[in-house]
């Protein structure tokens, strides 16, 4: 993916495979936040953070409260106080927060501090990162109990829903991703940081599709999920803007999962699929394959060769060249090869280069199966993009590749549609009633911002929204009978794309399941490289 300097910071924090238009959307949020007006979400806001002696709601107590009144993005007033917890602060907590027993010795008690906080807050809307934690500690005593009646907005929910393609939604990572003031894990510093990213989060919600924001706004009543109020207010803003632009009351459409998937693959958002970029012929055992000469492979691993040019610190390794030539020989003679190589040899590039060159020149497909999904992701998101770029620059060809994992790694659109129809419920998690609304909202937003990537990086609490309710199995899949079959389906859409790819990367589990299913699960593939083969036996079905 080509990125300019404007996108570099955000790009470093998005998950691998994030579509270019989504990266651009994220990169524009800071600028949008500077000029937008978010109405009631931007006025009479108090951003709050607390520090405590630990994370136990029953045993631990407050050590610091910090709050800032926010008016249209500007801090107008501060409230900061240490709190005497009535017990020693553990050393590890002091090390984390830089708050010591001497700091709190003469501080107000939790009840006194929360009374002062309540007077400062008044009827303002409260914003906190992981709001349930702060809300519990400031309202569990008589001094702050009245703050239960205020509207609480969880900025962590907003981040996970509006920015699902970020690698992390911790406050410190949001600060870095959007170049906001840096948090030092003191409550006042964290409040300042949250003040800096709060409007960016509102911009991110505003940038979501109108019908999705509207649907999320109605997922749960405010008493079950108070952060839903943000989506209700922004949905109203979006309707108002649409009406203003149209000159009359804008027509609203019900949320459609199918329409959302089609939009993701619209010409404006979607680069040409692999089928238009690659020429992979129908597979046949009689189809001749053309591979490079051994001398070409050897030259590629020289400092100024195809592989050598990929790395600034490249050092030729004899073992890597020997392995690459042996892989080439095995391909050329259609024989099996077992290779054992030590750490640091560069095994993956030693088999990827001859695989890529052979697949490109022959219009065929070569597969790679890894033991772990971590290695699979490294190959697909790190090594193959580098190889694709250098092969294109050298005029060798446009290498296409696809990763395929098992059904359980991808959301099933049919099951997601059932979730959409059923709406959010309250579920009991470790003795607490929790709404499914934020999890459903994050799932739908991820689907909207994703082409065919797996959901392994999606931050969902599967105790709230079980994974089996989102994913399917080969037995459960309705295949052509499913209304989402084809390009809208993560699994079958990705499989269709794989049919035109030069290199197919999968894991041992799916590779051996495909063998057992006599090739039903994966597209026909002429040659296979089984990496980490010493662990293959454990994956046999």
Predicted stretch roles:
Residues 2-37, 199-294:
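Acidic two-metal-ion nuclease catalytic site recognized across multiple nuclease folds
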Residues 4-151, 164-185:
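Conserved non-catalytic scaffold segment of RNase H-like nuclease domains
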Residues 122-142, 161-237:
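Acidic, Mg2+-coordinating catalytic module of metal-dependent nucleases/exonucleases
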Residues 291-338:
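Conserved pre-motif I regulatory segment
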Residues 328-329, 349-362, 382-386:
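Walker A/P-loop NTP-binding motif
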Residues 333-354:
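Walker A/P-loop
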Residues 524-541:
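SF2 helicase catalytic motif II
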């Amino acid at each position: 993916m080509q990125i300019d300097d404007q996108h570099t910071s955000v790009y470093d924090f998005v998950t691998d495979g994030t579509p270019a238009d989504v990266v651009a959307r994220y990169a524009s949020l800071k600028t949008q936040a500077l000029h937008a007006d978010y109405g009631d979400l931007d006025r009479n806001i108090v951003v709050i953070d607390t520090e405590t002696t630990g994370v136990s709601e029953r045993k631990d107590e407050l050590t610091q409260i910090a709050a800032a009144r926010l008016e249209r993005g500007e801090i107008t007033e501060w409230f900061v106080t240490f709190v005497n917890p009535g017990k020693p602060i553990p050393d590890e907590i002091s090390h984390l927060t830089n708050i010591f027993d001497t700091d709190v010795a003469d501080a107000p008690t939790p009840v006194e501090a929360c009374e002062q906080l309540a007077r400062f807050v008044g009827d303002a809307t409260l914003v906190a990162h992981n709001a349930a934690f702060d809300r519990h500690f400031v309202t569990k005593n008589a001094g702050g109990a009245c703050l239960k009646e205020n509207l609480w907005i969880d900025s962590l929910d907003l981040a996970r829903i509006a920015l699902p393609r970020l690698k992390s939604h911790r406050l410190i990572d949001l600060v870095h991703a959007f170049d906001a003031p840096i948090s030092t894990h003191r409550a006042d510093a964290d409040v300042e940081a949250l003040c800096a990213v709060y409007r960016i989060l509102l911009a991110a919600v505003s940038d979501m599709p109108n019908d999705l924001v509207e649907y999320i706004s109605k997922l749960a009543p405010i008493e079950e999920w108070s952060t839903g109020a943000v989506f209700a207010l922004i949905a109203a803003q979006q309707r108002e803007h649409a009406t203003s632009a149209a000159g009359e009351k804008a027509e609203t459409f019900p949320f459609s999962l199918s329409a959302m998937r089609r939009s993701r693959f619209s010409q404006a958002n979607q680069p040409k699929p692999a089928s238009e970029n690659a020429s992979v012929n129908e597979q046949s055992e009689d189809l001749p394959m053309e591979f490079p000469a051994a001398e070409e492979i050897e030259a590629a691993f020289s400092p100024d060769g195809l592989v050598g040019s990929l790395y600034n610190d490249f050092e030729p390794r004899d073992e890597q060249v020997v392995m690459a030539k042996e892989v080439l020989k095995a391909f050329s003679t259609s024989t099996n090869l077992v290779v054992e190589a030590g750490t640091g040899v560069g095994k993956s590039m030693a088999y990827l280069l001859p695989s890529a060159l052979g697949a490109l020149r022959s219009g065929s497909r070569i597969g790679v199966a890894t033991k772990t999904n971590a290695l699979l992701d490294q190959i697909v998101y790190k090594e193959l993009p580098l190889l694709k770029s250098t092969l294109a620059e050298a005029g060798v060809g446009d290498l296409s590749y696809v990763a395929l994992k098992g059904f359980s790694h991808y959301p099933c659109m049919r099951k997601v549609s059932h979730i959409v129809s059923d709406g959010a419920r309250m579920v009991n998690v470790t003795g607490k009633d929790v709404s499914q609304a934020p999890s459903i909202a994050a799932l739908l937003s991820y689907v909207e911002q994703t082409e065919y990537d797996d959901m392994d990086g999606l931050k969902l609490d599967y105790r709230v929204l079980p994974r089996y309710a989102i994913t399917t199995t080969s037995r459960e899949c309705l295949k052509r009978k499913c209304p989402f079959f084809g390009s809208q389906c993560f699994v079958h859409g990705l499989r269709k794309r794989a049919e035109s790819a030069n290199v197919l990367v999968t894991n041992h589990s799916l590779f051996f399941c495909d063998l057992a299913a006599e090739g039903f699960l994966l597209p026909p593939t002429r040659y296979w490289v089984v990496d980490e083969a010493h662990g293959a036996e454990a994956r046999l079905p």
